């Protein structure tokens, strides 16, 4: 190959390989050295449309493309760019470039993949990715989500009536190659929508929603046989393994059985593999980094297979994790994890941290984080309070969706309900409460700094949103902010958007009265570092002790 290979997969017959390479797309040049050959040392970037940058990189007119090459005696022939040499988009999709979005059929004659074939402003406004299938024999590609010819320019009114206008990703072939299972979001522009489990019939081109009455995401999908699917779902602050018996090919959505939740317990199943009727899964808890467990497919019993970190655990002290259900201001029950320090003594008093989750649509689960690690925080003598406030998945769609357009509302009250509930404990030192969070959690910290009514003695905000108006012009995936804020700041007749911007944290800095630590990084293009600079400047000019 004439360039680096960034992922590959050999088909089962062993006669073909797909691979991913970054290619320069003619007409999409953004770097001055590419545009002006007589200026090879120039370093300017030139843009006439969105998106200039994405996640953590600038658009330089180079895209990841998917190639297929024949294999003979283990050697690859010249590859064919099945995306198209002039296609200014990525396969697998940006910004994570996950090669799990690419899947060979078991016969090795077809390749399914995810693509979002949009560019410019359309790309920034839309989540409309689709599943494509390339046939090796004919060289023909079919969009199984939109069988009509061509595509329309992004328009909210048009896409509302377009099949599959949201994210469609992660195709997985059934063992007999008749079906493709994939994950799909129904709402255009809503990146945190319910991940439905869909089944495409390659014979009839019919698509069936397999989880219409299941109120949770379906992720990490795998076939056990032609009539059984397994997947992972977030369930009440954990991730569990589920099994779904499939309907007959001519069944309608109304005859689909609910998935069976096979595993249970306070753990996260993060990934799994199946072979010979056995299941091996990666499992974490707040007290255990990833280990391998065998899962009994009948009753979900977990049997630990690996103990990679046993020698380390034998020499450190870990605190305990308690599950607490807190009553919210609107009479709901909210799961809150409480992490206690090692050698916890209820007769003593402990400084306590309120943890604010990012996302905002991310569950506070039994994850082992290598960044925001609750066990590490607790090891320093803190109690950590981690509520699953409004807006997180695993508690049903109503709980998840409430936060959209209401960043400053019920979820903020949920945070205060959690810390107030724990603060009533005699071992909680109410004079030493802190509040910490990253991303949306950083926004939460900034907002709470203006309304906490002297509950907290210190705040830590990591890459948080401070100023909604400047954020709208600085971020890149505008579909996200359009959905979560309700629209742009100039939409004066849009009450949801106007309510969001009226409650931006920067408008309440005059109420700040508590020291704050602000952490940021220049390669965060989702919430640029300028948000942190604005917050730091505002804090210091208001006389608030602050560190950046």
Regions found by a protein language model. Give the residues of each.
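Glycine-rich His-Gly loop
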Residues: 22, 116, 284, 355-359, ...
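Predominantly five- to eight-bladed beta-propeller fold
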Residues: 22-85, 99, 114-117, 121-132, ...
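Active-site-proximal cap/loop segments of hydrolase catalytic domains
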Residues: 373, 378-379, 386-548
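Conserved beta-propeller blade repeats
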Residues: 1-20, 52-59, 65-66, 85-114, ...
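Short loop/turn segments that connect beta-strands within beta-propeller blades
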Residues: 71-75, 135-139, 201-205, 245-249, ...
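Cap/lid segment of the alpha/beta-hydrolase catalytic domain
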Residues: 119, 301, 307-431, 438-439, ...
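Beta-propeller fold detector
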Residues: 77-84, 142-147, 208-212, 252-263, ...
């Amino acid at each position: 190959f004439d360039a680096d290979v960034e992922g590959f997969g050999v088909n089962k017959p062993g006669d073909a390989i797909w691979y991913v390479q970054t290619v320069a797309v003619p007409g999409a040049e953004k770097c001055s050295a590419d545009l002006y050959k007589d200026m090879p040392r120039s370093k300017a970037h030139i843009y006439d449309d969105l998106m200039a940058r994405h996640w953590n990189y600038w658009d330089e007119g180079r895209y990841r493309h998917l190639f297929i090459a024949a294999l003979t005696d283990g050697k690859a022939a010249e590859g064919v760019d099945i995306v198209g040499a002039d296609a200014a988009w990525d396969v697998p999709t940006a910004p994570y470039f996950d090669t799990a979005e690419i899947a060979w059929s078991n016969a090795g004659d077809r390749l399914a993949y995810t693509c979002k074939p949009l560019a410019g402003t359309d790309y920034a406004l839309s989540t409309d990715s689709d599943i494509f299938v390339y046939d090796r024999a004919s060289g023909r590609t079919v969009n199984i989500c939109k069988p009509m010819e061509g595509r329309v320019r992004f328009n909210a009114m048009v896409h509302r009536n377009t099949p599959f206008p949201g994210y469609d990703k992660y195709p997985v072939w059934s063992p007999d190659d008749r079906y493709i299972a994939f994950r799909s979001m129904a709402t255009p522009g809503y990146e945190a929508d319910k991940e439905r489990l869909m089944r495409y019939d390659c014979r009839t081109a019919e698509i069936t929603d397999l989880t219409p009455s299941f109120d949770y995401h379906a992720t990490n999908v795998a076939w056990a046989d032609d009539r059984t699917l397994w997947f992972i779902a977030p369930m009440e602050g954990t991730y569990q393994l589920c099994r779904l018996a499939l309907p007959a090919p001519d069944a309608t959505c109304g005859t689909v059985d609910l998935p069976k939740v096979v595993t249970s317990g306070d753990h996260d199943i993060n990934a799994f593999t199946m072979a010979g009727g056995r299941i091996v899964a990666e499992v974490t808890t707040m007290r255990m980094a990833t280990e391998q467990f065998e899962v009994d497919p009948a009753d979900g019993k977990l049997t630990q297979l690996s103990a990679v970190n046993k020698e380390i655990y034998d020499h450190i002290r870990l605190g305990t994790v308690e599950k607490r259900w807190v009553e919210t201001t609107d009479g709901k029950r909210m799961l809150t994890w409480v992490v206690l320090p090692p050698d916890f003594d209820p007769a003593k008093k402990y400084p306590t941290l309120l943890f604010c989750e990012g996302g905002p649509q991310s569950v506070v689960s039994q994850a082992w984080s290598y960044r925001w690690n609750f066990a590490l925080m607790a090891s320093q003598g803190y109690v950590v309070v981690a509520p699953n406030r409004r807006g997180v998945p695993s508690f049903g769609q109503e709980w998840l969706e409430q936060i959209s357009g209401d960043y400053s509302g019920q979820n903020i009250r949920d945070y205060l309900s959690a810390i107030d509930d724990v603060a009533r404990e005699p071992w909680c030192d109410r004079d030493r409460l802190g509040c910490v969070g990253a991303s949306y959690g950083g926004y939460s910290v900034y907002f709470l700094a203006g309304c906490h009514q002297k509950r907290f003695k210190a705040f830590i905000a990591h890459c948080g949103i401070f100023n909604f108006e400047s954020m709208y012009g600085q971020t890149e995936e505008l579909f996200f902010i359009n959905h979560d804020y309700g629209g742009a700041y100039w939409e004066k007749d849009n009450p949801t958007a106007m309510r969001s911007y009226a409650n931006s944290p920067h408008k309440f800095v005059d109420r700040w009265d508590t020291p704050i630590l602000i952490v940021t990084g220049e390669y965060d293009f989702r919430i640029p570092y300028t948000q942190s600079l604005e917050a730091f400047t505002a804090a210091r000019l208001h006389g608030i002790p602050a560190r950046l």
